[in-house]
Each structure stands twice: as structure tokens, then as C-alpha cells.
Amino acid sequence: MRKVAIYGKGGIGKSTTTQNTVAGLAEMGKKVMVIGCDPKADSTRLLLGGLQQKTVLDTLREEGEEVELEDIIKEGYRNTRCTESGGPEPGVGCAGRGIITSVNLLEQLGAFDDEWNLDYVFYDVLGDVVCGGFAMPIRDGKAEEIYIVCSGEMMAMYAANNICKGILKYADAGGVRLGGLICNSRKVDNEREMIEELARRIGTQMIHFVPRDNFVQRAEINRKTVIDYDPTHGQADEYRALAQKINDNKMFVIPKPLEIEELESLLIEFGIAN
């Protein structure tokens, strides 16, 4: 079972990219589980046909300790197993702590046991690595390979670099490695070349360049992944390609984060700062 975590700047399209990629893996016949690690609880909606899933923490709050696996895991597109950790009530408590509680409960209830024949577990993690709770999949060895969703925008690259610092910090203890950058295009000038160069300097690869296409939003409005909504569309092939590249990936590295000056010089070199 491969344990994958998807990180990236808030709003970069992690949940969309994760769900569309998982749909590609499921179409290949892979058995996948998706764990949403975001209080917004939107990491599995497209796989479940738009259903807002009841989160692990909400279920715990309402039902106490008497929780069964079927209470917190729902079957989605092509038998993907979907769960959302959820978070505390707004303004109260720590969302990162909620992720730790949820993942530990899933383990206790046997969500990762051999009987499920899982090929992949995907953790879709909120925003940058800003606190220990959100770093938990990296820190505690829950995830073994990380993919960072980014774009050619400065803050997305800055966040990607920060996440690499988090991976570096826990690489020895947790055994986690970076599998590559996924460029979720924002149509920035020289975007593909810039992210390829960023990946090279960090010591990794740009595993796939996902072109920007409004069809992704159209599929979302219809509460589906692109592959589910229109399997013949060109954008569906992009996500299939990304799924195949992740499935075939053999390049797992401890990243070499850049100094802020190096990052800024990269932006200047490729024209974004002009």
C-alpha cells in the first residue's frame, strides 16, 4: 500500500487535483482511500457525487466513542473509500489536533487493514505546513511520498519551498520523501519552464503540468470529477496521465529547499518580477 500526501498553498487546487487523480487511479483498477485533512471537508465531494460527508470529528461529537468504520467511511467513484477528518467548531480548538485524532481512530478501527486490499491511501492536507498537526502525515510516517501542487505564482512557489523544509525536517525520522511537483497551471508567463527549473533546483521533478481548463469547474458544478463527468474530454486525459505518472514514479528524494534569495532570483530570471 502506497501512502501519499498532497500538499500545497491554500486555494491552489489540491482537493480538485487529488480527486481527479484518484479517479484516474480508480479507473486503472486501483483500490484507493482518500482522507480529507481539512476542516472544510471538501476533499471527497466530487468522488461522492457532491455529497457533503459527515466528518470523523462531527461523528465523534455526536455519537461518542461508539463509532463504527461504516459511520465515517463512504464508498465513492469506482469503490474509492472516502473519509473526512473535519475540524473543531470555528474559533474553538485546533484543526491540526483533529487530524491526529481522526487518523488514529481510523487506524484503531482497521481502516488500513489488509482485508480492504488498498493500493493507495491519499491524504489531502490543508494549506502550507504551518503547524504540527497538519505536518502529522509527514511527521509520524503516515505518508511516505509527498506531491506538492503549485503554480508559477510567487506565493504558490514560496509555499512549495516551505513544504520542502517540512519534508527535510522529518525525512530522517519519518522516512518521508518528495515524489515531485504537480503544476496546476494559472497561465503565468513561462510557467512550465519555471516550475521545471524550481523542481530541478529543489532536486526533484515536475511530475506533470496540468493545463488550465474551465471544464474542470464545469465538472465540479455537476459534482463530479472530470473523468466521471466526461471521460472523453481532453482534460480527463491530463488527469489519467498524472495518475499513471504517480503510479509509475520511482523518483523519491529528500528535497533541498531554496533560500528566499534563490527563489526570488528564479522569479526574476523567468520574468514574473519584471
Swiss-Prot record:
Protein name: Nitrogenase iron protein
Gene designation per UniProt: nifH
PROSITE patterns xrefs: NIFH_FRXC_1 (PS00746), NIFH_FRXC_2 (PS00692), NIFH_FRXC_3 (PS51026)
Cofactor dependency: [4Fe-4S] cluster
Binding annotation for ATP: G8, K9, G10, G11, I12, G13, K14, S15
Reactions performed catalytically: N2 + 8 reduced [2Fe-2S]-[ferredoxin] + 16 ATP + 16 H2O = H2 + 8 oxidized [2Fe-2S]-[ferredoxin] + 2 NH4(+) + 16 ADP + 16 phosphate + 6 H(+)
Function (record text): The key enzymatic reactions in nitrogen fixation are catalyzed by the nitrogenase complex, which has 2 components: the iron protein and the molybdenum-iron protein.
UniProt cross-references to SUPFAM superfamilies, sorted A to Z: P-loop containing nucleoside triphosphate hydrolases
MF terms (GO), sorted A to Z: 4 iron, 4 sulfur cluster binding; ATP binding; metal ion binding; nitrogenase activity
Free-text cofactor note: Binds 1 [4Fe-4S] cluster per dimer.
EC identifiers of the protein: 1.18.6.1
Chain positions found as ADP-ribosylarginine: R97
